[in-house]
A protein has these predicted regions:
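Membrane-helix boundary/coupling elements in multi-pass transport proteins
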Residues: 161, 165, 196-213, 326-348, ...
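Membrane-interface loop-to-helix entry segments
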Residues: 15, 46-49, 56, 189, ...
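Extracellular/periplasmic helix-exit of transmembrane alpha-helices
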Residues: 105-119, 163, 271-293, 353-386
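Helix-loop-helix module between adjacent transmembrane segments
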Residues: 4-28, 61-63, 98-102, 139-210, ...
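Membrane-water interface regions at transmembrane-helix termini and the short interhelical loops
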Residues: 1-6, 31-45, 64-83, 132-139, ...
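Flexible loop linkers connecting adjacent transmembrane helices
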Residues: 2-4, 36-42, 69-87, 111-135, ...
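Loop-to-transmembrane helix boundary motifs in multi-pass membrane proteins
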Residues: 5-23, 178-187, 225-241, 245, ...
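N-terminal alpha-helical transmembrane segments of multi-pass membrane transport
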Residues: 1-128, 146, 268, 272, ...
């Protein structure tokens, strides 16, 4: 890489930073008022505006289906052969689904739907049981991953057809906004993008950190306190600082690859020692229940019974995925040079879905079997100790748990460290003025944003409970939803006229491509 781009774009650096600082300070100085404010924001956006998330997500899925079957399907991201072999490319897409969040939710999400089901069903009833394992597949399924893929098509077009370097989403809005995308409106778009991604990662870290602390407590006996959570966040920041200033970025990437293999090994082990036949049978049954109820799940707002189920779960999940959509779409596009739109949309969407579905099939059904056989009582454990403790207790029932728990510790630690590192890098790129191809943002800028991400995550943990974590994603992603709409509408309007179709008939042979 050439010398670092060190000049900061003041209009992009300070506004999101000040917003985060004001919010964190207010919460720390008056936690009760902070909690009330968080609850009000969450209630307004999910109760009054929640339908917008659902309509947008379903419409986005329709756009992605259009990309698969419509006139763009055979158009290629650049005239070259694919950069990576098909097997390597699918492997990178598949491994992108491994995260601390999926380790957190996959063993236990069904329980919340079983005890407080949608559609007015009786808790713990057979009908609630069927939906309990189907709903996670919906929340982490095609509609959610399509959010990444839709904008990913646009970024692939910008990167490899138009030859543009896209570090900020405002660049992708030029097709619809014209010169305004380079002015104050463009700055506002980039600021909202930063706020959304900060909120999304804060939710992820806020989930993963207490779980990691509980694993440490189980292994070492060290009490789980806010101080332990803070220590973990500090260690992550130090590791990122060492990687940045010590030139160990390649080491971080290798750790990310190791994390993926570790996750797959853990899945294989639980699949082997757990109720394998039940896992497959219940997973297939859950798929059927999900597809049978897909449109109702997609548009369920519960205005009559007002159970809060779609607000607390469906809208939260959609908002969380939206928060990461632009940055993930950029990543997916960057590794997909030479692919057709159809190849990209199918590969990127279903590789991620298959990965997370594997986690839910194995971990979720393992827990359900434990609960059914009376090995654990989730209701009592969660009431007495909380969700992270319950998840650790689930994994503690595995044979050789004394070996498995340290493996989970390493998996969680690496997963969260790599995601903080990547998001800090993204924020540093966005806030660097006139960054050119081959240049890196300043090292201090990357480390600074890692500290900011850790600080806001700790603030949300300090408030306690799920609501602050959910509210962060819902509030932060609301503007991002409109940015995505601008990007998609502008692309369809412009690319429909300008995209060269001369490469449509070129073969997608990847035998001569490099394997990475």
């Amino acid at each position: 890489m050439s010398q670092e781009g060190k000049k900061i774009d003041q209009m992009l650096f300070w506004p999101p930073l000040l917003l985060v600082a004001i919010m964190c300070s207010a919460i720390i100085l008056n936690p009760e008022a902070g909690t009330n404010a968080v609850n009000k924001v969450f209630s307004f956006l999910t109760g009054k505006m929640g339908w917008t998330y659902e309509v947008f997500v379903l419409a986005n899925l329709g756009v992605v289906l259009y990309f698969i079957f419509g006139k763009f399907a055979n158009k290629r991201f650049g005239g070259e052969k694919p950069e990576f072999s098909t097997l390597s490319w699918l492997g990178m897409l598949f491994s992108a689904g491994t995260s601390a969040a999926i380790v957190y939710w996959s063993p236990i999400e069904f329980y919340f739907y079983l005890t407080a089901p949608p559609f007015g069903l009786e808790p713990m009833s057979p009908q609630a049981t069927a939906l309990a394992t189907a709903y996670p597949l919906f929340h982490w399924g095609p509609s959610s991953y399509a959010l990444y893929v839709g904008v990913g098509v646009v970024f692939g077009y910008l990167f490899f057809v138009q030859g543009k370097e896209v570090f900020r989403p405002s660049t992708a809005c030029e097709s619809l906004l014209g010169k305004h995308a380079s002015g104050y409106l463009g700055k506002a778009i980039d600021i909202f993008y930063m706020v959304g991604i900060i909120a999304g990662i804060s939710t992820s870290v806020g989930l993963g950190t207490p779980l990691l602390s509980e694993v440490i407590t189980k292994i070492t006996g060290i009490p789980h306190t806010l101080g332990l959570d803070a220590t973990i966040l500090i260690i992550w920041t130090v590791i990122i600082g060492i990687s940045v200033y010590g030139g160990l970025d390649k080491g971080i990437r290798r750790l990310s690859d190791f994390r993926n293999w570790l996750g797959f090994a853990l899945l294989a082990y639980v699949l082997a020692v757990g109720p394998t036949a039940f896992m497959f049978n219940n997973f297939i049954d859950s798929l059927g229940v999900m597809f049978n109820n897909y449109f109702r799940m997609s548009l369920y707002t519960d205005p009559v019974l007002k159970s809060g189920f779609p607000q607390d779960w469906t809208i939260f999940y959609f908002a969380w995925f939206i928060a990461f959509a632009l940055s993930t779409g950029i990543y997916l596009a960057r590794i997909s040079r030479g692919r057709t739109v159809r190849e990209f949309t199918i590969g990127a969407m279903f590789s991620g879905v298959i990965c997370v579905y594997t986690y839910f099939m194995v971990f979720g059904n393992y827990t359900m079997d434990l609960q059914a056989r009376g090995v654990i009582n989730l209701a009592e454990i969660i009431k007495a100790h909380g969700v992270p403790y319950a998840i650790v207790e689930i994994f503690s029932t595995l044979p050789f748990a004394s070996i498995i728990l340290p493996i989970i510790l390493v998996l969680l630690f690496i997963s969260t460290a790599t995601v903080i590192n990547s998001i800090a890098y993204t924020l540093a790129m966005v806030t660097t003025a006139q960054l050119k191809t081959g240049e890196e943002p300043a090292k201090w800028n990357r480390l600074f944003w890692a500290v900011v991400l850790g600080g806001i995550s700790l603030t949300l943990i300090f408030l306690g409970g799920m609501k602050p974590l959910q509210a962060a994603s819902v509030a932060g992603s609301f503007p991002t939803m409109f940015i995505m709409a601008i990007i998609l509408i502008g692309f369809i309007k412009k690319a429909g006229k300008e995209w060269d179709i001369s490469d449509e008939t070129k073969p997608s042979d990847s035998t001569d491509t490099k394997d990475n």
